[in-house]
Amino acid sequence: LADEIVVINRNEKKALGVVLDASHTTAFAYSANANIRVGTYEDCKDAQIIINTAGPSIQPGNSRDRMVLLQTNVQVMKEIMTQITTYTRSAIIINVSNPMDILTYIAQKEFNYPRNLLIGTGTLLDTARFNKMLADLCGVDAKNVTGFVLGEHGGTSFIPWNAVNIVGIPFHDFQKQFGLKEPVDCEKLLHEVKVSGLDIVELKGYTSSGIALSVCRLVGAIMRNERAVVPASVVLEGEYGLEGIAMSLPCVISRNGVERTLQIPLDKEGEKNLKICYEYLRNVIESIS
């Protein structure tokens, strides 16, 4: 996707290891050979896209709540944004670090970074997990499922079930159309989506493949100017009448970053879940302001 990749890490030895490991894959790639090297924050001045993965992550056996990372990673994010904004305010920043929505909000608001250029991976991977799980239940390809996980990348995320469909077949017709023995258990499925990433951490120590491809999906949409609609974390500016937080909404992603956000019509259950999510994230932000 990119012809030049610069790795920045306070541990230069580790950065060099990442560069060496990644550079060996270029022999297999049927694309332009990328120049992969170790760099510094000064390299940000020429960057089109900056991907932030810095800070500690959830560890096996510890809390399953990403908010335990809050205090440490807020400081890490502030340090990184101070460095980045010294050299650029025009690069698209993709935040991968947790707690996702809090860090995305702080990075945009405290540094007055252009809203459309600061994107969190948010519920993009949660949505992929949901589509895969629902597709398996119905016996179809996950790419035929249209459905979004919205809100927080965490415990208050929710699914607007009224907007879920498979090739136009509405969710309430799934049992009949796909020959299911019983209706889809919405609460159970959403719970499985929420905990699956944490389950992977317990099993292998970390998550990697899913989030890596999620980042690639965003980078690809930007580099190819796709105007793809994907769920991503963005600071709200009046969507659903809300502001003062970042959370995931369907976003149109292009070379300009977030071209626009879309608002899925919500039923009463969706509106209730949106309010719960908003109030939770707002309380967390106020606790660190």
Name the predicted role of every residue range.
Residues E110-L117, D126-S289:
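C-terminal substrate-binding/catalytic lobe of Rossmann-fold NAD(P)-dependent dehydrogenases
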Residues S31-A91:
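Rossmann-like NAD(P)-binding element
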Residues D65-N131:
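Rossmann-like NAD(P)(H) cofactor-binding subdomain of soluble oxidoreductases
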Residues V7, N52, I93-N95:
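Structural beta-sheet core signal
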Residues I8-Q48, N283-S287:
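Conserved N-terminal Rossmann-fold NAD(P) cofactor-binding segment
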Residues L1, G55-Q59, S254-V258:
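Short connector loops/turns at beta-strand edges and beta->alpha or beta->beta junctions
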Residues D3-V6, L118:
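Short beta-strand element of Class I
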